Amino acid sequence: MVSQQTTDPQLDAVGRPMPVFPEPPPLASHGPARVIALCNQKGGVGKTTTTINLAAALAEYGRKVLIVDFDPQGAASVGLGISPHELDRTVYNLLMERDADIHSLIQHTATPGLDLLPANIDLSAAEVQLVGEVARESVLARTLRPVLDDYDVVMIDCQPSLGLLTVNALTAAHGVLIPLECEFFALRGVALLVETIEKVRDRLNPRLEVDGILATMYDPRTLHSREVLERVVEAFGDDVLETVIGRTVKFPDASVSGMPITDFAPEHAAAQAYLRLARELVARGAVA
C-alpha cells in the first residue's frame, strides 16, 4: 500500500532507488519554527490527513509541532478530537482582532508535542473581511510571529482554494508541501498551484520554496495509480517525495476516533509511511 511494498525492496513504486532515511536525532533545543503550508486547491487529496499524521509523526520524533487549521470546515480540528463548533474563539479571532492572544487560542492535543490552532465556519467570513486590510496577505504571518520560537514546525492546513486565506498561508510559510492524489484529474490543477506559489514568491515571500509533492491514495494494484505516479515523477522530478501514501480505510477510521494514525494503529503500513515521510523531510532539510 505504500512505496516500501514493491517486488524489489530496493526500488520505489516507479522504479527509483529507494533510500533509507535514518531516524532523526533528538534536538538540543526547540525553535524557531519552520512554517510549512499544505496546499492543493483540489479537495479530497489527503491534505488534512497528511497535516495531522505528518505532524504526529514529527512529534513522535521529538519535534514540537503546531497545526494551524486554516480551513473553515475545521477538518484538522475534528481529526484531532476537538469539536470546532463548540469553540467561541478560533484562528478567525486571531486574524480579525489585533489584541487577540494567540497563546490563549492554542489547544493541546492528546498527542504529546502536538498543538492545534483550531478553526470553524467563522473563518469563511475572513476572506471577505480581510480584503480591506492593509497588507492583507500578511495577516497570518504577523499573528504567528509570537509563537514561532515555541515550536520546531508550524503546519498550515489550507482550504481547497487559491483565495486570500491560502495566499496568507503561502506568505507566512517557508515551504509548501503539495499532497497529490494518484488520479489523472488531480494532475491538472498542480500547474495552477505552482504558478500561484511562484507569484507569491515573486511579490510577497521570496523565501518560499516547494518542499515536495507527496503522492497520496496510491493503490499499487491498479495500473491507473502506477501510471499517474510515473507521470508525476516525469513532470516534477526530484520535487516528488520518495515516500508514497497508500489508500486505506484506516485513515477515516482514525479521523472518526479523533486520533492520528500513528496513535490509532501505530503498526499499520499507513502509520509507518508517515513516519518515513517525517524522516524523509528531515533528511531533505525541510524540517530540523
Model-derived features: positions:
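P-loop NTP-binding core
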Residues: 1-288
